[in-house]
């Protein structure tokens, strides 16, 4: 992290996690592997791929538009940790976005980043989780290390009084409220090396995609 980095102060009080008013220390830049071993109760389960939902094809059509990027999922372990285990059992790499003492304390409740170089059939499980506010999808052409640096930096935000807060941007309810309120500068800082954010909409029956253009924030619905 640059030595002169100052956490942005975009979200309002309702968009941050007030349970952690001190804010976490931003972890080291490199990715930290998670879920090195699968819990026995989960390892013994037979994970069944759901019937294909038409939304899966719509998601694939959207992300294929950015051929030079990789697709990732950020899973909120406090809402749907099973999605992280399913990803690992399907052969996807998963990394915790916390490290050190924080990673140990909330290993299965914090956010984790999953690389989806082969989106199918995992996206079928992702769509099946709609309504759980399980996390967000994103695309980036950055290296994994550079992406992790950015995703960790935007965890920490300041209020008007300079107090640090932990920003749960990977919660669909937060990001879809936050992004439309951003200025151009705030969008640039939040997007960083991310080219697209995707999360379920308020109905939990469709997705919304956001990209940043010269004209500002561009949103589009992903629905059947």
Regions found by a protein language model. Give the residues of each.
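Terminal low-complexity "docking" segments
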Residues: 5-11, 17-19, 23-167, 172-224
